[in-house]
Amino acid sequence: MKLLNPYKFKHFYLNKYFISIIKSKTYFISYNYKYKALWFRTYKVASRTIDDMLKTNCEDGSYIYGSDMAYLPNMFKDYFKFSFVRNPESRFISAWKDKVLRQNYFHFSNKEYEKMKDLDYFINWVKTLDIENCDEHLRSQLALVDVDNMDFVGKFENFEEDFQFVLDRLNIKDYKMEFLNQGIKKEFELTDTQREEIHKIYKKDFEHFYS
């Protein structure tokens, strides 16, 4: 008989069925009870690499890859809370390439899907979204991170150094860092107009993280 994972029991019943009733703001958080860490996930920002690191020596189930739920910061005062962000331009292009050019992730109709392969058309579609509450791959990073309670926000552009800082802070010594989910990367040159539109969409992200 498989024993109930106490970490998962605590996480799901407390966060999903109690805290979510009294707190409306939610985040995609991964909990590591072994290393006492909370990772606020920002998609298209080395997520698989960070996830792999947090699984280190956690065969006991002490690592929970949580879904979109509320949480109470006061319950995790002694936890290391961190996240990583990425320049909104490159993050946006990465999302478009992965979720549109490589697959029809957003389930557009066949006709609409062909149009979305044109970056200008896709940008105009994203402009119609509530950027703070839309799909997490396009959502504002500021909306994905509880900035008032962060201990550390690393940068994708300085990933190796910032990632090592997290490893040292969590005292994880036996993890060999390597980028996961890395395909062939080709530079994509945005037009001035495209760049301007992306800056408008992610104005708050640029102001807070890349001013």
Protein language model regions, located:
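Membrane-interface amphipathic segments in extracytoplasmic regions
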Residues: 1-211
